[in-house]
Amino acid sequence: FHGGSWYRFPWGY
């Protein structure tokens, strides 16, 4: 995802 951003999950892919 964004590498550390709360997009849809807290771990941030």
Curated annotation (Swiss-Prot):
Keyword line: Amidation, Ion channel impairing toxin, Neurotoxin, Potassium channel impairing toxin, Secreted, Toxin
Tissues of expression: Expressed by the venom duct.
Localization per Swiss-Prot or TrEMBL: Secreted
Domain of life: Eukaryota
Keyword Membrane recorded: no
GO biological process: envenomation resulting in negative regulation of voltage-gated potassium channel activity in another organism
One GO MF term attached to the UniProt entry: potassium channel inhibitor activity
Residue positions where Tyrosine amide is found in the record: 13
One cellular component term from this protein's GO annotations in UniProt: extracellular region
Functional note: Inhibits non-inactivating voltage-gated potassium channels in rat dorsal root ganglion neurons.
Misc: The mature peptide does not contain cysteine residue.
Name recorded for this polypeptide: Kappa-conotoxin Mo1659
Lineage: Eukaryota, Metazoa, Spiralia, Lophotrochozoa, Mollusca
